[in-house]
Structure formats: structure tokens, C-alpha cells
Curated annotation (Swiss-Prot):
SUPFAM superfamilies: Anticodon-binding domain of a subclass of class I aminoacyl-tRNA synthetases (SSF47323), Nucleotidylyl transferase (SSF52374), ValRS/IleRS/LeuRS editing domain (SSF50677). A motif ('KMSKS' region) lies at residues 602-606. Belongs to the class-I aminoacyl-tRNA synthetase family. The lineage of its organism: Bacteria, Pseudomonadati, Pseudomonadota, Alphaproteobacteria, Rickettsiales. GO terms for biological process: leucyl-tRNA aminoacylation. This is Leucine--tRNA ligase.
Length: 835
């Protein structure tokens, strides 16, 4: 099998089978899988992702489209730097070696990529364009530097964006993330929050789950900003944001973030307060607040109520208010907010009901809208009426105004790492921040770097960062932070349109290919890569690089590949190939000691539940692997890897070769019986496989092709064979299977005597009239109860149906000699005889 696969891979390469032109009279179709990080090896999860994309690309080519199906490398990132530290070598060497190996693996799987458009994000010829783009953003005030609290990963020694912190830990290292106050570069994604939110409704070919995740991440809140005066210091105020300002008369405390500026200015930092601030610094995302037990510590400060100066409220540092949401301060209304209620119970704060409810708010918060009570002039108003009234009063008093808030924050793009795209800025003591002139781009990374595992090597390099200021020509220093690697992947899909363009994009080529018609990747990128790419596309549109404002018309999120985990008697993880099954138990191959099978989980290096792709290819071939990852589960669901599953796929491919030999030896027989049912199944399969592929029901398409294969096999085994339909059916089967298992189908197609390559052929056509059955079965009911069934010819009349069904013995028994009162027909389905 490997020889056949290598043969066809060589032919495709020599014939430039999958290279496409930007100038074609055909309609375009752009299918793209998320580009991989060159970690060293392609894993089975990659193969599933890329196999899905390859089926779609090959199918759309067969449908007459000019299909762009490119591949490249998201090549900057921490693993390369960690490998450099470990091996004392440059990350570039490690990265390029991995790319070479992974490209070879991808080609060995037979994916139909246009390799002439390959991109590599760590190539200066690629990243020089994003450096220029960053400078353009800076000129438009869409890029800026400021000091802020950031998420610090103590293991990777770098800053993480909010989206890269999962359950309080770094998304890559797993380390507990802390807060640090550092100067960082940001992009003003918040300027586009409203458009990013509004356009979600137009992404009709995206999964609802992803659209919902983006909506929640952007998190639009409509309410009011207003001020509370600090008691005994009325010139100082605390500004709060609230989505329910109408509950102001139920306020019992002011909650502030642990890093609110007022703490530094006015709060005496007792050991209790300092300990609490340290504890809070580990909470980095609002999603974590929902899980955390609500806690607080009193600051010693009080504020006065804006509508009644006799009411004073304590100011409390809480662990559920974040500085980067709203103003970093809220007023707590325990009767009508669950977080506030939990804290009030814990700290013995008052719980005052201000919305009418048929429940005890001392026990549980009532969070719905309703009629206002205990609220002075707001009594009797609905929640919405009271909201408008109270905001109007804030505006009259000059203490507040209506406001819209977003959970989305500006994107922090600074990373304190070496292996990333250098940020093209210079710091001058005289001129301040100075952009690198366009003519001096790209700013490249030095080759002579010392990796000792401590901080950013660019900071310690003896010469790289020392330059003269472009403005005053005095000594200055380069910015040593590099871009977040999501910067590169936020625009790469535009580069494929013409990877040799002298500018960031070839606009004419982008106008032809964009938007991407189908983008395929994991749902874990819903609020990072996918949101950033949407943001970049909007800005690139404004910079005249592209004409579209949304990058991806359709999105498909595939499931993960899972495998059982195994541990030995010492609790050490084992690779699957180290384990053998005997009966219902598992044993270590070498020691024969009993092995414990654990949960079926996502494949990971740490738990060793990995499958070595090269070993699988040697044993079964690329086609069998492709078929298995597509056939055993719907593509959007998780797939459990199983040895029996891939063995079954290998047997199916071998069966195709046996079928070819059997059919090739058949002689035309004028006495053979015409098999109308097989002919109908051929046309039925063509129609429904096409529909299944269009709807990404690839496992169902494979099941239909297996059914056709079985029907053809059954016909071959008969004494009198319909040779004509068997040959036609097998030809069709080979064509239908080609997008899934391209190597063996091209081989069989050639052996069948065909000169044209399968990759150049159109998808088989079906005849609608051939789908009609000669007969159909109807359910026969008496007074709505099923009594019998009967098979009718398609030519039968309604009167004949009535006569036949009434005369059926089971019906006659129910009639007991009576005449039917009425007979109701549901065409080709039901006859209901009423007595």
C-alpha cells in the first residue's frame, strides 16, 4: 500500500495537481484548516482536521470550483524557545527542522495542498509586513503602550492575554497566573467591540456555540456610571458602573477590585488587607469569579448614598470585582444580586429588598425585574421605568450618566520572549517612543543569542537592542518585547491569496479569494484566534489591504481524537503500544504485569495516550488512517481511536482491490438479469453522498458508500450477474471514495483502463428518475389502528388501493360485515378505513 501511495504522491507533485490560479472562469472556493505549530510531528488530531478539509477541497473541485487549499506554519512560540534552552541551540534551527519533517508527513498523507503558496510566520519576509501593519495601527492610535496589571506566567516568564488564562492557569504551561504591573503594548480591539458583536448575527454558517461564546466574551452591558462621595473626604469619589442602577436604594456596600487606585491613596494596608490582595491577584478572569467563593475585607472607608447623605455604605475590597471591567467598583445590592447576597451573608451586611417578589430575599437573591418598593420616588415603577428615572436624576445632579460597558478588553500583545516577531519600536530618552522607519523593516532577531532560561534573551544581548534614535540620532534602545503569536495567525489567511505579494496582501487576489468559504479548526480558538482574526480583517479593510470585513464565511469545529490511558503498578503512564489486552484485562508487554486502563481522554504527551502516525502509516497506509478518522464518528464529535476501527478500514480498502479483480475478470453475459434495485442504489448513493459531504456528515457518506460496496459484492456472487450495472456501480463507487481515500482509488481507476485522473474528473451525476421505486408499502389502519401493510405498484390508482385494502382478511375481520364509513388516503404512506 505504501508503494501505491508514494507513486501517486509523486504523480500529483510532478503534475502540480493541486496548484490553482488566481485567474479562472470557474467560481472560487477557499477551504482552509487552521495552520499548525511546527512541534515536530503531525499527530492524529491534525490528521482528522486536515482529512475533513481535504474531503471538502477535493469534493468542491469535483463540483467545478476553482479551489484554494493552502498550508503553512504558525512558527513562532514558546516550545521552540524551551527546546533552545534544553538543547543550547537557536530556536530557528529547531523550528525549520520540524517544518521539514512535518511537511514530509503531510505530503505522505496525500492532502491536496497547494504547496506553492506555503507560508512560514517566522520568516522575515512574512513578518516584515505585520511590523509595518503595526506601525500603521500606531499611527492611527490603534496601538499604544501603557503600564497595567497583566497576567504573569511564572513558568514561561511572560505576559498572557486574558483569553490565554484558563481556570487561573497559563494555557500552555499550566502554572498559576499572578498579576504584575508592567508596561505593555495593546491593540484597541475595544474600538471595534460593537461591530464585532453586531456582525455575529450575520455569521450564519458558524456553529451557534462559537457565536454564543464570542457574544459572551465581548459582553455588552448597558447601565450607568455614577459617583459616591467618600465620607469625611467629599472631594474624593468612587465611580461605579451598574447595569441595575434602579436598585440604588437597596445598596448596602461598595465593592472594589483589589487593585483599585483608591486603595493606594486612602487605605491603610493591614496584614489582613495585604493577604487578601495577594489572594485576589491570582484571579485573572471573570469566568473564575463565578466559581470562587465570594469574599471581602473592609477598607475602613465609607461613602455616602447619592440620594440620602444620612446613609453611609462601607467600602469593601472583594474578590469578585475586576479592575478591567467597568470602573473596578460596584455598589452591592444583596437582595437582588447573587454575588452581593453571598458576601452580605458572610460579612453580616444588610439585605434590603427594593423589587417586589414572592420570596424571602434574606435567604436568596431575587434577580428578576419587577415593581420597585422601598425606593422613595421610584416606588411603583417598573424596573425599566425606574432605571430611566434614576439615570436622569444622576445626570441632573452631575454625578453620573448612561454608559455601555464591554467585557472585552484591549488586546495585550507584548510578550517577554525571544522567539517572536520583534515589536518595531525604539525608546529614546530625548524623543520618547519612536517607530522604526518603514525603510528599516524588517527588524529581525539576532542569531547569536544565549539561552539560559532566565527572562528574555533580547534584554541581555550585548548589541542588538542598542541603536541610534531615528529622530535625533542619539543612543537609544529597541523594544525587546515580541508580538503575541496570535498576531501572526490573525492575518495569515490573506497571505495565501498571493504568498509572494510585495505588500502585506495582493488586494486583487484577496478580492477574488476572500472570504474563506470554509474554515476548519478547534472550538478552543473561539475567543482568541477567531476574534482576533475578525478584528484584524476590519482594520485591514480600512487600510485597503482587503475588501471584506469578515474573514470566514463558514466555520466548522471538529471534535478531538481520544484514546484510553494506561498506568502500571507504580502509577506511571504507559504508551498504548506498551500494553496488550488478554481477555478483558490489560498487561505490560515486557513485564507481563497487570496494567490499569484509565479514562478515555484527549491525546497528550504527558499521559502518553498517543498514536505514532508513522507507525500507523507503515502498518495500514495513509488511506486507511484517513478513512478511519472520518468514518467512526460525526466530524463535529469526539472520536475514540481504536485498533479494531483502523483494521476494519484497512480491510475495506483491501476489499476494493479484490472487487476490482473480480469485476475485471467478468465477461458480458447477454442472459444476465437486470438489477434495477442496484441501479437505483447507485443513483441514490451519488445523490446522498454529495448532500452528506455538503453538510459535513462525512461518516454518513462513508456508511452509504460501504452499503453500495456490499450491494455490488452481493451481485458479483450471484450466478447471473448484471455485469453492466456492476461495472458502472464500481466505477461510481471509486469516484465517490476518491476525496476520502485518494491513493487507492486513483490506482484502481487507472487499472480500470481510464486515462483521465480522478482529481480532474467531475463528481458523478445521478438521474432523478432512477431514484423512483417500482413499488411502495402502505400502512393499513382501521379507525386509526394499524392492522396490516401492503405493497403497491407505483402505477396503482386510488380506487384500486381502496378496493385492495378493504378486501384484506385482517381488515375484513375488523369490519365484521359492515361497509366502511370513509377511507382516508395519505399518498404512499397510510390508508385509514373508518367504520
Amino acid at each position: 500500500m505504501n508503494q501505491i501511495e508514494q507513486k501517486w504522491q509523486y504523480i500529483w507533485q510532478e503534475e502540480k495537481a493541486f496548484e490553482v490560479s488566481n485567474a479562472s472562469s470557474k467560481p472560487k472556493y477557499y477551504v482552509l484548516e487552521m495552520l499548525p505549530y511546527p512541534s515536530g510531528k503531525i499527530h492524529v488530531g491534525h490528521v482528522r482536521n486536515y482529512s475533513i478539509g481535504d474531503v471538502i477541497a477535493r469534493f468542491m473541485t469535483m463540483q467545478g470550483f476553482n479551489v484554494l487549499h493552502p498550508m503553512g506554519w504558525d512558527a513562532f512560540g514558546l516550545p521552540a524557545e524551551n527546546a533552545a534552552i534544553k538543547n543550547n541551540s537557536h530556536p530557528k534551527k529547531w523550528t525549520y527542522s520540524n517544518i521539514k519533517n512535518m511537511k514530509k508527513q503531510l505530503k505522505s498523507m496525500g492532502f491536496s495542498y497547494d504547496w506553492s503558496r506555503e507560508i512560514n510566520s517566522c520568516d522575515p519576509e512574512y513578518y516584515k509586513h505585520e511590523q509595518k501593519f503595526f506601525l500603521e495601527l500606531y499611527e492611527r492610535n490603534l496601538a499604544y503602550q501603557k503600564a497595567s496589571f497583566v497576567n504573569w506566567d511564572p513558568v514561561d516568564n511572560t505576559v498572557l492575554a486574558n483569553e490565554q488564562v484558563v481556570d487561573g492557569r497559563g494555557w500552555r504551561s499550566g502554572a498559576i497566573v499572578a498579576k504584575r504591573y508592567l508596561k505593555q503594548w495593546f491593540l484597541k480591539i475595544t474600538d471595534y467591540a460593537e461591530e464585532l458583536l453586531n456582525e455575529i448575527q450575520n455569521l450564519k454558517e458558524w456553529p451557534e456555540a462559537v457565536r454564543s461564546m464570542q457574544e459572551k466574551w465581548i459582553g455588552k452591558s448597558i447601565g450607568a456610571n455614577f459617583h459616591f462621595k467618600i465620607k469625611d473626604n467629599e472631594e474624593t469619589t468612587i465611580e461605579v458602573f451598574s447595569t441595575k442602577p434602579e436598585t440604588i436604594f437597596g445598596a448596602s456596600f461598595i465593592g472594589i477590585a483589589f487593585n483599585h487606585p483608591i486603595i493606594e491613596r486612602l487605605v491603610s494596608k493591614t496584614p489582613e488587607i495585604l493577604a487578601f490582595i495577594t489572594q485576589c491577584s491570582h484571579i485573572t478572569r471573570s469566568s473564575e469569579l463565578e466559581k470562587a467563593e465570594k469574599e471581602g475585607v473592609f477598607t475602613g472607608l465609607f461613602v455616602t448614598h447619592p440620594f440620602d447623605s444620612n446613609i453611609v455604605l462601607p467600602v469593601i475590597i472583594t474578590n469578585f470585582v475586576l479592575m478591567d471591567y467597568g470602573t473596578g467598583a460596584i455598589f452591592g445590592c444583596p437582595a437582588h444580586d447573587e454575588c452581593d447576597h453571598e458576601l452580605a451573608v458572610k460579612m453580616n451586611l444588610s439585605i434590603k429588598q427594593v423589587i417586589k417578589a414572592d420570596m424571602d430575599v434574606q435567604k436568596t437573591a431575587y434577580t428578576e425585574d419587577g415593581i420597585l418598593i422601598n425606593s422613595d420616588v421610584l416606588n411603583g415603577l417598573t424596573s425599566n421605568e425606574a432605571k430611566q428615572e434614576v439615570i436622569g436624576e444622576f445626570e441632573k445632579l452631575g454625578i453620573g450618566k448612561r454608559s455601555v460597558n464591554y467585557r472585552l478588553k484591549d488586546w495585550g500583545i507584548s510578550r517577554q520572549r525571544f522567539w517572536g516577531c520583534p515589536i518595531p519600536m525604539i525608546h529614546c530618552e530625548i524623543c520618547g517612543i519612536v517607530p522604526v522607519p518603514y525603510k528599516d523593516l524588517p527588524v529581525t532577531l539576532p542569531d547569536d543569542v544565549n539561552f539560559d532560561g532566565h527572562g528574555n534573551p533580547l534584554d541581555h544581548h550585548p548589541s542588538w537592542k542598542h541603536v541610534n534614535c531615528p529622530k535625533c540620532d542619539k543612543p537609544a534602545v529597541r523594544e525587546t518585547d515580541t508580538f503575541d503569536t496570535f498576531f501572526e495567525s490573525s492575518w495569515y489567511f490573506t497571505r495565501y491569496c498571493n504568498s509572494n505579494a510585495t505588500e502585506m496582501t495582493d488586494k486583487k487576489a484577496c478580492d477574488y479569494w476572500l472570504p474563506v468559504d470554509k474554515y476548519i479548526g478547534g472550538i478552543e480558538h473561539a475567543v482568541m484566534h477567531l476574534l482576533y482574526a475578525r478584528f484584524f480583517t476590519k482594520v485591514m479593510n480600512e487600510q485597503n489591504y482587503v475588501s471584506v470585513r469578515e474573514p470566514f464565511k463558514g466555520l466548522f469545529t471538529q471534535g478531538m481524537v481520544l484514546h484510553a490511558t494506561y498506568k502500571d503498578e507504580h502509577n506511571n503512564w504507559l504508551y498504548p503500544e506498551e500494553v496488550v489486552k488478554k481477555g478483558n484485562e490489560f498487561f505490560h508487554k515486557e513485564s507481563n504485569n497487570r496494567v490499569v486502563q484509565g479514562r478515555i481522554e484527549k491525546m497528550s504527551k504527558s499521559k502518553k495516550n498517543l498514536i505514532d502516525l508513522e507507525t500507523m502509516q507503515e502498518q495500514y497506509g495513509a488511506d486507511a488512517i484517513r478513512l478511519f478518522v472520518l468514518s467512526d464518528s460525526p466530524p463535529e464529535k469526539d472520536l475514540e481511536w481504536s485498533a479494531s476501527g483502523i483494521e476494519g478500514c484497512s480491510r475495506f480498502i483491501n476489499k476494493l482491490e479484490y472487487m476490482f479483480k473480480a469485476i475485471d475478470s467478468l465477461k458480458d453475459d447477454v442472459n444476465s438479469e437486470v438489477n434495477k434495485e442496484l441501479n437505483r442504489l447507485v443513483h441514490f448513493t451519488i445523490k446522498h453522498v454529495a448532500e452528506d459531504i455538503k453538510h459535513f456528515a462525512l461518516n454518513r457518506a462513508i456508511a452509504r458508500m460501504r452499503e453500495l460496496s456490499n450491494a455490488i459484492s452481493a451481485e458479483i456472487s450471484k450466478d447471473k450477474i448484471d455485469v453492466k450495472i456492476v461495472r458502472h456501480g464500481f466505477n461510481v463507487l471509486v469516484q465517490l471514495l476518491n476525496p476520502f481515500i485518494p491513493h487507492i482509488t486513483e490506482e484502481i481507476w487507472q487499472k480500470l483502463g481510464n486515462k483521465e485522473r480522478l482529481y480532474n474528473l467531475s463528481f458523478p451525476a445521478f438521474d432523478e428518475s432512477m431514484l423512483e421505486l417500482d413499488t411502495y408499502i402502505m400502512a393499513v389502519q382501521v379507525n386509526g389502528k394499524l392492522r396490516d401493510t401492503y405493497e403497491f405498484k407505483t402505477s396503482v390508482s386510488e380506487d384500486e388501493i381502496k378496493q385492495v385494502t378493504v378486501s384484506l382478511p385482517k381488515v375484513q375481520k375488523c369490519l365484521e360485515g359492515k361497509e366502511p364509513k370513509k377511507i382516508i388516503l395519505v399518498p404512499r404512506k397510510i390508508v385509514n378505513i373508518l367504520v
